[in-house]
Amino acid sequence: ASAAGLLTSLPSATYAVSKHAAIALAEYLSIRHGDDGIRVSVLCPQAVDTPMIAGRTGSAAAANDGVISAQALADCVVEGMDAETFLILPHPQVLTYVERKAKDYDRWLDGMRRFASRLSGKVGR
């Protein structure tokens, strides 16, 4: 999945929705099959230094929270799976963002609207 599935990535609706769906599927599998001894983990990184982000400038996640290497991501995955952690967050600050979102959804939506306006170059609001 991606942090985009927890926090709604901008500007791509299809990317955000598909990542939300991946997290929902992982939750479902964990709920339905956890008692069968099946462990499910979902990986939710922000920016990772891969060809997918090569050449992109202005990535909000990369600018704010940094880009991690593929090796650091792999290490985080192994550590999370060894610990049987459901939610693997290579960028630990994502948990803070999710907690803020859950605490006051309306405030989070307002903040995301302002953020979207800044990304698109709109002034005001």
Stretches with model-predicted labels:
Residues L7-T14:
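Active-site loop immediately N-terminal to the catalytic Tyr-X3-Lys motif
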Residues S18:
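Active-site helix of classical SDR
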Residues Y15, I23:
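Catalytic tyrosine of NAD(P)H-dependent dehydrogenase/reductases that use a Tyr as the general acid/base
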Residues S2:
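Residue(s) in the substrate-gating loop at a strand-loop-helix junction
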Residues N64-R125:
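C-terminal tail/cap regions
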Residues L7, Y28-I38:
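Active-site-adjacent segment of SDR/Rossmann-fold oxidoreductases
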Residues P45-G55:
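Short, flexible catalytic-loop segment of classical short-chain dehydrogenase/reductase
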